[in-house]
Amino acid sequence: MSLRVLEPGPLTLVQDRGRPGLADLGVGPSGAFDQRALHAANRLVGNPEGCAVLEAVGGGLAVVATAPHVVAVTGAVGPVSVDGRPVASGRVLSLRRGDVLRLGAPTVGMRWTVGVGGGFVPEPVLGSRSFDTMAALGPAPLSPGDELVVGPPHGAVSLESVPAYLAAADVGVGVVLGPRDDWFTPAAITTLLSCPWRVDPVSDRIGVRLEGPLLERARLGELESEPVVRGSIQVTSSGRPVVLGPDHPVTGGYPVIGVVVDTDALAQVRPGDLVRFHRRRP
């Protein structure tokens, strides 16, 4: 059983929970950018939450079913169709052999997640089926004609739908300051937590780059490379913040002013959206 790719869209990847715990080998975590969407799609189709799904940026993905399949589309909000008929996202969808599932351009959010009963089962690499865009590790991005093999169903479908959780294009996320907030002036900390930050168009799975006031350092010089995690807010030498995504390097030399708590929310920001940081206590 499989789904065949007719059109891959701008970028569609296979993703699961990723490769946590391999930083000592120089391997980043990768995995689905929007973990909530991963879990929701898998719950809808009766899979364990960590089964591999498709993560599609923007619109344009089209796949045809080569056999009957149960699928679910979560994450972004926008037009979804089966054989040209509009259908709802966040719900269980039944595909017959020959049916074409097509995703339009999102009206809210950035990344679609497509789950299928049984999960997608390309050959895992280091325990995961995720593609790491920085390391080029894992199953390659989708291309026209690819056959996406699907595993056997895990169990009966128990949910019909899940509630949407995306809001307007002004995202508030919690941030815990540190570990290098002492490298910045008090004014820079105030600026980080009080100003809206605009998402730069060059943002990707490696990092969400933000435009806004420059953050002034209290300490000059270079920081020795040290471990970083997803959600780390690195401040570049120019004073611009970058929030690291799932495909981040395992170490970095820019000081980390804080760490974002809700990293899933940043999976769905679009170029030009505003991000606001709110302080959380450890």
Predicted regions, residues:
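Conserved "landmark" site that anchors the functional core of diverse proteins
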Residues: 1-282
